[in-house]
Amino acid sequence: PGFILIDKVNQMNNNWFCEDIRATNPCGEQPLPPYGSCLLGSVNLTKFVDYPFTDKASFNYEKYRKVVGIFTRMLDNVVEINGLPLAEQRHEITYKRRHGMGILGLGSTLAMLRMPYGSDESVQFTEDVVREMAVEGWRQSLALAEEKGPAPIMEDEFEITPKMMNKCPDLAKDGYKVGDILKGKLLHAKYSRYMQQIGHV
């Protein structure tokens, strides 16, 4: 059993301007809107430990970044051959090009690096690994947008509603009002609370 802080999830949703997250799968890694779909995959961290269980043990970040980059492209390609059963699901995934990448083997990797689980060193390592995945994923996503074009949602125009103004007070601060029209890419990149954090990474 578990619970979801659905208001917080919606607050941090990149696509806050065009969807409401309703639920998540039992493990909680991918909250989705109605008919939403997200292709998931994980990178096995144990494969990047050099000299495991020794004093020379280290994590090969160069190899890790390369695999994350390739995997980002692979997941994006799977969007196009998704095989989803419902037309609404197929529209959702091709319109937003959503995919999700995570990690597995963290505990084993920490043991291979001789880091006690829960130590300050292990917490910092975990933050570093996740940050590197996010940054490399964003880097590849930008390259993919240049090669394939952006996801259709980015080029669509959205009319600002009272609900959007309430969710994002920054719109009013920037001089926008109800009825104004903005591109999805602006609403996504500038006004998503999650995307605003990229500058701090």
Predicted region positions:
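Function-dense linear segments that define catalytic or interfacial modules
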Residues: 1-3, 7-93, 105-109
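Eukaryote-specific, cytoplasm-facing alpha-helical/coiled-coil scaffolding segments in long proteins
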Residues: 16-19, 98, 132, 168
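Glycine-centered flexibility motif
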Residues: 41, 100-105, 149-150
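Short secondary-structure boundary micro-motifs
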Residues: 61-62, 100, 126-127
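Internal maturation/activation junctions in enzymes
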Residues: 67-90, 94, 116-201
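Extended amphipathic alpha-helical segments enriched in small hydrophobics
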Residues: 97-116
